[in-house]
Amino acid sequence: MTATSSPTTRFTDRVVLITGGGSGLGRATAVRLAAEGAKLSLVDVSSEGLEASKAAVLETAPDAEVLTTVADVSDEAQVEAYVTATTERFGRIDGFFNNAGIEGKQNPTESFTAAEFDKVVSINLRGVFLGLEKVLKIMREQGSGMVVNTASVGGIRGIGNQSGYAAAKHGVVGLTRNSAVEYGRYGIRINAIAPGAIWTPMVENSMKQLDPENPRKAAEEFIQVNPSKRYGEAPEIAAVVAFLLSDDASYVNATVVPIDGGQSAAY
């Protein structure tokens, strides 16, 4: 089975909530899960991104049920609103891909402003916490649920020039493990993925920061240290997320899964 092929019934009648659903990993995962029968609640700060993701989902799965909600994941009231919208529409939340995030500026720590640090941590860590806080209550009352948080290889090792991103993603790893220990007794599994160099709009922007004049050269040089010598693709991440949210991963809990072509082992 390839990363883009899938069973057709694994998520039938299951409701999956995806933040950051308007692009990149969120969109690819939405398409994957819809192909497997999921009902989707997609959340993003971009209404245009959400509409594009919904169109991509319906192209793959014309009968899919898709709810879209524009929200800033760092705003508690907006998080409450997207969770409420999901439960009012579907009645439950079986899976949660807690994925929204930004990269932020690339600067050494002494040049990384407090304002930029706060911005990145607010979205990448506070946003993950707020989503968990609201969704876990629902899952506990249901007696079941699966969560996948998006961390990063930058959350399991040092990467340099990204103080806010590294701090937030390390925090996501800690939050994942702590919450998994707390909620396993309620039939809830909480894991995280740690993507590496996956070619998404975020990584493309990162290359532009590294070399504004020649981002393609920066991209080619960056990937040479990766044992796989290539960038990953969003559907490859979606396949792992789908596994972790499915019953196939029924005894996988409190785990952080690198999806990086061997990058974290080589550094």
From Swiss-Prot:
Binding residues for NAD(+): 17-42
Keyword annotations of the record: NAD, Oxidoreductase
Top EC group: oxidoreductase
GO molecular function annotation: oxidoreductase activity
InterPro entries: NAD(P)-bd_dom_sf, SDR_fam
Keyword Cell division: no
Residue positions of the active site: Y165 (proton acceptor)
Keyword set includes Mitochondrion: no
Protein name, as recorded: Levodione reductase
Organism of provenance: Leifsonia aquatica (Corynebacterium aquaticum)
Gene from which this protein is expressed: lvr
